């Protein structure tokens, strides 16, 4: 089951948070605030960087449907780009030349060495650190995941050489949370205890399925039911799921939308009261 689309209805959610959210596919989001600022989370266009895209094509028949992309003028209007971690489906080095150097780049610790050495404005951040970008306070928060980018057996590997995490955008007392890749852990409650209730939560629901290593996959990727529990821990006023879909490489899932089907099933089974807003790639919502 591929090339699907969500055709259901979303509830009317009037929370006046002042955020406009566009899902570009997989983990990529464009966020606009009520004062006209613009932010990007994990922008990745097309397929992985070389040589991983080439290697992936050799061992898998799964390809990515081209995701929604931004125009050059939209990229030029971006105040800051935030990356959650260094994995190929969240950071594409080849995209940097298209994004340009007008924006600030906020990254986890150890990330800057993966950028070209020619003028990019990069701020590396530790967990629970903050940076003011215009009128928006940006917080880097923990996630239960890992990092790696390069592995040549017996020669080089960079496992956990860079940090990983999620992000909180805070503007005029309203907060938007982007989880990054993560498994479920007490860190969600820790984030709520430090920053308060979240208005908008962007939480992954996919990449948890593995026949060979089911326990490990779930440790580092939330299932749909884990995501609902995390949203409750954060006291989210609305949750937007991501990670499934036509532009998500079907990684760790049986079909492109199996995670969304599971979310809908578990939402009813768990009697969750977290408001959901489901987007298709390219769609946006004002909250």
Predicted regions and their residues:
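Pre-active-site segment of Zn-dependent metallo-hydrolases
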Residues: 7-12, 36-82, 93-98, 148-152, ...
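Active-site environment of divalent metal-dependent phosphoester hydrolases
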Residues: 46-48, 86-91, 112-115, 129-132, ...
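Short, polar loop motifs at secondary-structure junctions
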Residues: 25-26, 107-114, 126-128
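Active-site neighborhood of phospho(di)ester-bond hydrolases with catalytic His/Asp-centered motifs
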Residues: 40-42, 63, 77-86, 106-108, ...
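Active-site regions of enzymes building and remodeling cell-envelope glycoconjugates
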Residues: 118-125, 137-138
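Active-site-proximal loop/helix segment associated with metal-binding centers of metalloenzymes
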Residues: 46-53, 140-173, 186, 195, ...
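Conserved beta-strand hairpin/beta-sheet module of binuclear metal-dependent hydrolase folds
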Residues: 14-70, 160-180
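Cap/insert and terminal regions of metallo-dependent hydrolase folds
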Residues: 110, 175, 183-280
